[in-house]
């Protein structure tokens, strides 16, 4: 047993309290993720105006739409897919976003689905650009290159919040014994950090490579979708399935099943892009 194995004993998931409201590390990490994604996008607009011909004010307006779509979709998606008492929320819809419990205590809004957020993001992007659909693929590509590094902080937030824990490490796994984290007296994979690396860093490198080697609008979001799906599928083997969900056909988790659907959506966007997108002009 090393110091890393027992790191959860060394810190509190609550960063600080403000006026009786507990601020979690996850909330701070999520805020960092938004800021990083925002400024990464601005940098991309500045560095590559041929690929991203968007004015700053225009992007700021779009970013608000996209973020709202992500938050709404992520929360609603979690309730519909993962919440065991989802029928209650269908008749008490306002409770989905109520940060207080029935006793009036502030508990925050817990439970967000990445894939639900993805659907919300796509819907918001379409609604924002419906009057000028030529820009839809440009917006999607911009988020594809800007999101992954921000996503890293989101998963680090999950780790600090001690949630979405990993599967139990096999006793014969030497590496697992080194990197594992003690949770409920069991050594588990740090799946949140594995996801941060695979779904954040590796996917970013994939999209960055595509940016350098493709000249068609819409391909970056396709590479992101396919790359994320593959990395999430792999990472799920180290992540404990949600207790209320378990595993399904071929022992696949819900995250893996939704990732397969994400592949289908990505291929649909690829088909749309190849038919409606124009080649990007070379920089002069």
Curated annotation (Swiss-Prot):
GO terms for molecular function: phosphatidylglycerol-prolipoprotein diacylglyceryl transferase activity. Its EC number is 2.5.1.145. Keywords: Cell inner membrane, Cell membrane, Membrane, Transferase, Transmembrane, Transmembrane helix. The chain crosses the membrane at residues 18-38, 62-82, 106-126, 136-156, 190-210, 218-238, 252-272. GO terms for biological process: lipoprotein biosynthetic process. It holds the Pfam family LGT. GO terms for cellular component: plasma membrane. Disulfide bonds: none annotated. Catalyzes the transfer of the diacylglyceryl group from phosphatidylglycerol to the sulfhydryl group of the N-terminal cysteine of a prolipoprotein, the first step in the formation of mature lipoproteins. This is Phosphatidylglycerol--prolipoprotein diacylglyceryl transferase.
């Amino acid at each position: 047993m090393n110091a890393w194995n027992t790191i959860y004993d060394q810190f509190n998931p609550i960063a600080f309290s403000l006026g009786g409201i507990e601020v979690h590390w996850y909330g701070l990490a999520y805020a960092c993720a938004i800021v990083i994604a925002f400024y990464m996008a601005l940098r991309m607009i500045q560095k590559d105006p041929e690929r991203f011909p968007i004015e700053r004010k225009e992007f700021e307006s779009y970013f608000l739409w996209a973020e709202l779509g992500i938050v709404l979709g992520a929360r609603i998606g979690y309730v519909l897919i993962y919440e065991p008492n989802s029928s209650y929320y269908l008749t008490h819809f306002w409770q989905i976003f109520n940060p207080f419990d029935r006793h009036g205590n502030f508990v925050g809004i817990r439970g967000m689905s990445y894939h639900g957020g993805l659907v919300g993001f796509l819907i918001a992007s379409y609604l924002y650009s419906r009057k000028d659909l030529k820009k839809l693929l440009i917006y999607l590509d911009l988020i594809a290159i800007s999101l992954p590094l921000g996503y890293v902080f989101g998963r680090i937030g999950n780790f600090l919040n001690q949630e979405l824990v990993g599967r139990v490490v096999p006793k014969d796994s030497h590496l697992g014994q080194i990197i594992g984290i003690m949770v409920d007296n069991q050594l588990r994979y740090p799946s949140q950090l594995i996801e941060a690396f695979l779904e954040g860093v590796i996917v970013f490198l994939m999209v960055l490579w595509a940016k350098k080697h493709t000249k068609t609008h819409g391909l970056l979001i396709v590479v992101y979708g396919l790359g994320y799906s593959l990395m999430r599928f792999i990472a799920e083997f180290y992540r404990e399935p949600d207790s209320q969900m378990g595993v399904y056909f071929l022992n696949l988790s819900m995250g893996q099943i939704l990732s397969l659907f994400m592949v289908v959506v990505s291929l649909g966007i690829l088909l749309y892009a190849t038919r409606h997108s124009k080649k990007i002009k070379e920089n002069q």
